């Protein structure tokens, strides 16, 4: 049976991951550990014979730089790379930039876990002025203001990720294009929820590790068979 493989990967550890802060759409770079994670992932991909025709990332530099490190190591810097805000991390609203332990102390662990892990519940919103500032960012100034988020639940994240998968990435993948997607914990959770038909309760338990390639296998009809981490 013919098997088609897609590579998904969460960016390497970011500076704010290291500092235990909510990051979301804030554009922070990789930590030193994150750089090493991306290089380790590149070595694993090379060891297992993975090479690519096309790559996708978000418009956030922790995703972009992870991808750069991988394709540079694979000597594939020439392949087309498409960046989209639709692959961005979930927008954590007013929590962005705050230390997670401080937020737990203020709101309680149960509430914070609802914000972080549930499918439907969104964290507190940013202000209108903060959203206007976001809308003036050159990465987002061509997007309808009403579409830009004040905050996002995983459900809202899914609603922006899936159209990009269905209309852009999947049609290219169906042409037997070898693709790598470097994105974020929650944008990947959204995609995996769809691909594996995970229900709204079970998705609470899905966590995506930084820096490890996820290999997604599809059959000849491009139906998902299984996915697994490439760790050795």
Swiss-Prot record:
Annotated site, Transition state stabilizer, chain positions: 184
Pfam family, one: His_Phos_1
Assembly, per entry: Homodimer.
UniProt function note: Catalyzes the interconversion of 2-phosphoglycerate and 3-phosphoglycerate.
GO biological process terms on file: gluconeogenesis; glycolytic process
Protein name: 2,3-bisphosphoglycerate-dependent phosphoglycerate mutase
Gene from which the chain derives: gpmA
Family, as annotated: Belongs to the phosphoglycerate mutase family. BPG-dependent PGAM subfamily.
Catalytic activity: (2R)-2-phosphoglycerate = (2R)-3-phosphoglycerate
Catalytic residue list: 11 (tele-phosphohistidine intermediate), 89 (proton donor/acceptor)
Pathway annotation: Carbohydrate degradation; glycolysis; pyruvate from D-glyceraldehyde 3-phosphate: step 3/5
EC number: 5.4.2.11
Keywords in alphabetical order: Gluconeogenesis, Glycolysis, Isomerase
Matches recorded under NCBIfam families: pgm_1, PRK14115.1
Example of a GO MF term: phosphoglycerate mutase activity
Residues noted as binding substrate in the record, renumbered to the chain: 10-17, 23-24, 62, 89-92, 100, 116-117, 185-186
Species, as recorded: Buchnera aphidicola subsp. Baizongia pistaciae (strain Bp)
């Amino acid at each position: 049976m013919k098997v088609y493989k897609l590579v998904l990967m969460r960016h390497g550890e970011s500076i704010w991951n290291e500092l235990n802060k909510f990051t979301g759409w804030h554009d922070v770079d990789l930590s030193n550990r994150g750089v090493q994670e991306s290089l380790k992932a590149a070595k694993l991909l090379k060891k297992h014979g993975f090479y690519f025709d096309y790559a996708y990332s978000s418009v956030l530099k922790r995703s972009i730089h992870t991808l750069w490190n991988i394709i540079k190591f694979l000597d594939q810097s020439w392949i087309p790379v498409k960046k989209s805000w639709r692959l961005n991390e979930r927008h954590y609203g007013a929590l962005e930039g705050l230390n997670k332990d401080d937020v737990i102390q203020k709101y309680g662990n149960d509430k914070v876990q609802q914000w972080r892990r549930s499918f439907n519940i969104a964290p507190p919103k940013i202000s209108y002025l903060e959203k206007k500032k976001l809308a003036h960012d050159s990465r987002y100034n061509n997007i309808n203001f009403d579409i830009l988020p004040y905050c996002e639940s995983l459900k809202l994240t899914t609603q922006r990720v899936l159209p990009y998968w269905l209309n852009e990435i999947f049609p290219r993948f169906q042409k037997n294009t070898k693709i790598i997607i470097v994105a974020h914990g929650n944008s990947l959770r959204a995609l995996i929820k769809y691909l594996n038909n995970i229900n709204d309760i079970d998705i609470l338990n899905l966590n995506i590790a930084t820096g490890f390639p996820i290999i997604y296998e599809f059959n000849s009809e491009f139906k998902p068979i299984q996915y697994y981490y490439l760790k050795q």
